[in-house]
Amino acid sequence: MRTSSMMKRMAAMSLAAAAAWATGAAAAADGAPAAQRTIQVLSVKGGDAASPQAAVWKKAPTGQVALQTAFPGHASIVGTALTQQMTAQAVRAGDRLFVRLAWRDATANTEIKDTDQFVDGAAVQFPVNGKDTTLAFMGDPDNPVNVWHWRADGRTRNLVAKGFGTATPVPAEGLRSTATRTRDGWEVVISRPLRVKAEEGADLQGRRTMPIAFAAWDGENQERDGLKAVTMEWWQLNF
């Protein structure tokens, strides 16, 4: 068997396993019913939504997002993620979408000084094709996903993935983030222009709804890569 064929077969098996696991986990999850997995985007003409403490966030509807340990995509990285819930809000200001995430995290892990240290993080994910039929776990070769990944060490990355282990950084000059360490956790705002080039990820311009998924990493718990807390199913942004 050729290497390329073998890799495709292994990828297909992993995707099938992930889909089956996600279906079972979602059915067992004590999360919001499908009708409630919706976040209404607050549209404003102007103003500052970049700061987690901006006044506009007091007006934006809040979603209570349940998280669970992700499918173990890497056999060498296993464990149980700690974060079980986060709140999510969204604001459209001009030509940008701002997403605000807040969650509890007892320790602030903001730098890596040794090989056994990892930083806190969070991410939102969109299907590039805008369809909720896309696999919520990192997509697949035919249906990629776009990830906005914030890290507590100050890095914010725009990624495109086509399945487990395929997350690839792609240029996105307009992707920005602002984070605040609170008494008991993190508050983070990630934003990006609605319209982007095809190679930059999911284009949000002109959409009335958009599937969105969430993730969090607790560095103190050795969480990194595929060891993370995630949503089992897509949520929906309503513009």
From Swiss-Prot:
Keywords: Electron transport, Heme, Iron, Metal-binding, Oxidoreductase, Periplasm, Signal, Transport. It is found in: Periplasm. Has potential use in bioremediation of waste sites contaminated with selenate, such as agricultural drainage waters. The keyword Transport applies. Optimum pH is 6.0. Activity is also optimum at pH 6.0 in the presence of tungsten. Heme b binds at H74, M138. Enzyme isolated from cells grown in a tungstate rich environment shows a 20-fold reduction in selenate reductase activity. Residues 1-28 form the signal peptide. The gene is serC. It catalyses: selenite + 2 Fe(III)-[cytochrome c] + H2O = 2 Fe(II)-[cytochrome] + selenate + 2 H(+). Its EC number is 1.97.1.9. GO terms for molecular function: heme binding; metal ion binding; selenate reductase activity. Heterotrimer of alpha (SerA), beta (SerB) and gamma (SerC) subunits. Binds 1 heme b (iron(II)-protoporphyrin IX) group per subunit. This is Selenate reductase subunit gamma. One of its GO terms (cellular component) is periplasmic space. It comes from the Bacteria. Its cofactor is heme b. Component of the selenate reductase, which catalyzes the reduction of selenate to selenite and allows anaerobic growth with selenate as the sole terminal electron acceptor. A c-type di-heme cytochrome of the cytc4 family was shown to donate electrons to the selenate reductase in vitro. SerABC can also use reduced benzyl viologen or reduced methyl viologen as an electron donor. This subunit accepts electrons from either a quinol-cytochrome c oxidoreductase (QCR) or a quinol dehydrogenase (QDH) via a soluble c-type cytochrome, and transfers the electrons to the iron-sulfur clusters of SerB. Optimum temperature is 65 degrees Celsius (with reduced methyl viologen as the electron donor). Full activity is maintained up to 60 degrees Celsius, with activity falling to 25% at 70 degrees Celsius. Substituting tungsten for molybdenum at the active site of SerA decreases the overall stability of the SerABC complex, rendering the components less thermostable. Coiled coil: none annotated. InterPro entries: Cyt-c552/DMSO_Rdtase_haem-bd (IPR019020), DMSO_Rdtase_II_haem_b-bd_su (IPR017838). It is an enzyme of class 1 (oxidoreductase).
